[in-house]
């Protein structure tokens, strides 16, 4: 069980809570004590079926403020027939009813309905939101300070000192981190090999909001991927923004040009697809560019993954949120659904009226 520490940001105080990571095992039936519930409709509108899809739920709800427990231990999500779903409660502010959560949807194409339940006895998640076969890492940056632990695989990135710690900022979902472009960086453990994929397919994703780049090459994700350094990275900066991957050599494909991507939240996704032997870049839920791997082999290498490069010439300046490392080649439909979920919340997630059981 992972405990998130309290966070105060933008005038909201967030209470600590836990998230299960038991791999999706079933939990006992929900407690029979009286509780409240609201129906949630998810308008996913995917052309193909998505399985074990994590949906972001961010809401400010007066009923939660009035009826939910302060530690959020009574808040849960179920199917419409009461079957518990896997969820992660990232943050809850009892005073305003502000909730940030993720819910794992077993399968969905067009739409699905579920229930938000609260106000009764404490209950547990029915497993982990982040399907172990899919997700290697998922960072939310909800902690008040570094280190920052991911919710999927327990990978940790740690700023070297308080002076090099990116400050909290409002994110695309809850809290994010704002890097100063000077010395802020959060490297992982050099002994952690859990984010290396050899010659297998994988994907990497980050949400960024950049007002002004620091340098020609600002690395928001840095795990090698350059000449003579196997791995992968996202290189932003004053020119085009790139996804890069390589062994001793590397290939790169652009997300787009800096001018078009400044001043707003941008979803960047790189898909390393070994089946088609291509590196694919997606920007804001849509395919951008792609390039063949050629002779690129294993991308395993010594540098640990860093969020915000530790290399002085590649410092990242901007806000980053919801960093993902994924064990599979994500589909275009999956990436597009993630983008709609984060940017079209009022259409993607709708709440019904409160009811009493």
Where are these regions (language model features)?
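GGW-centered surface loops in extracellular recognition modules
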Residues: 29-81, 93-154, 347-348
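Extracytoplasmic low-complexity segments
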Residues: 123-182, 290, 336-357
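Extracellular glycan-recognition modules
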Residues: 145-149, 182-242, 251, 276-278, ...
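Flexible glycan-contacting loops in extracellular carbohydrate-active proteins
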Residues: 171, 237, 290-319
């Amino acid at each position: 069980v992972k405990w998130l520490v309290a966070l105060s940001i933008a005038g909201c105080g967030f209470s600590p809570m836990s998230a299960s990571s038991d791999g999706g095992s079933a939990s006992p039936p929900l407690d029979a004590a009286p509780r409240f519930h609201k129906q949630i409709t998810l308008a996913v509108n995917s052309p193909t079926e998505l399985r074990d899809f994590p949906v972001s739920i961010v809401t400010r709800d007066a009923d939660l403020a009035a009826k939910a427990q302060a530690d959020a231990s009574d808040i849960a999500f179920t199917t419409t027939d009461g079957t518990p779903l896997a969820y992660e409660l990232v943050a809850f502010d009892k005073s305003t009813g502000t909730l940030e959560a993720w819910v794992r949807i077993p399968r969905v194409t067009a739409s699905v309905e579920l229930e938000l339940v609260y106000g009764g006895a404490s209950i547990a998640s029915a497993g982990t939101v982040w399907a172990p076969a899919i997700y290697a890492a998922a960072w939310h940056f909800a902690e008040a300070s570094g280190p920052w632990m991911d919710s999927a695989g327990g990978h940790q990135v740690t700023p070297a000192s308080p002076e090099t710690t990116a400050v909290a900022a409002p994110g695309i979902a809850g809290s994010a981190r704002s890097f100063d472009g000077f010395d802020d960086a959060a490297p992982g453990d050099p002994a952690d090999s859990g984010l290396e994929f050899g010659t297998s397919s994988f994907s990497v994703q980050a949400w960024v909001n950049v007002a002004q780049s620091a340098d020609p090459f600002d690395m928001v994700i840095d795990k090698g991927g350059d000449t003579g350094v196997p791995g992968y990275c996202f290189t932003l900066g004053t020119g085009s923004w790139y996804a890069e991957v390589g062994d001793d050599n590397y290939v790169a494909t652009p997300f787009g040009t800096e001018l078009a991507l400044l001043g707003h939240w941008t979803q960047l996704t790189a898909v390393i697809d070994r089946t088609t032997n291509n590196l694919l870049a997606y920007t804001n839920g849509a395919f951008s560019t792609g390039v063949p791997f050629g002779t690129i082999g294993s991308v395993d290498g010594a540098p640990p993954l860093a969020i915000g490069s530790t290399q002085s010439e590649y410092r990242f300046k901007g806000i980053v949120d919801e960093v993902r490392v994924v064990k599979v080649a994500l589909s275009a439909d999956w990436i597009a659904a993630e983008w709609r979920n984060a940017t079209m919340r009022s259409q993607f997630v709708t709440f019904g009226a409160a009811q009493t059981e």
